[in-house]
Amino acid sequence: PIYYTTQEIDDGTWLIDGGIVANNPSLIGYSEARKIFPGCKIKVLSIGTGINRRKINGRNSAKWGALNWFRHDILGVMLESSMFDEIARDLMAKDYLRINSSTGLVNRRMDDTSDANLKRIHLMGMEWWSEFGQDAIDFLNV
């Protein structure tokens, strides 16, 4: 419902965008890997899609009701929560690395494939590599 429409699959089951339930699917992946590879060391490199720093004015929001919270994208704020990241860090400790940073000037719309936005995405990737590249290499060096 956030980006992808609800879809019916062959057995008649209806599915919604997985980002609604697991915007950071690290915990689900870790749980499934433990089932498939019991007793094995499992490392998770979690690469985010960028943090879009949303600002909510405290003074104004104190007067909002439910409708105003939805108008100000409370779902987007909730989906960017670091709660899943914190739980993953607690469970996996040194076997978990999360890479995520500001999106900068990148347009967050998933369907913006303009040359200008693709250049911004490329620049963001290069900045992320400068910031996180060595950490990722060190982490994956098993």
Regions found by a protein language model. Give the residues of each.
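Patatin-like phospholipase
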Residues: 1-142
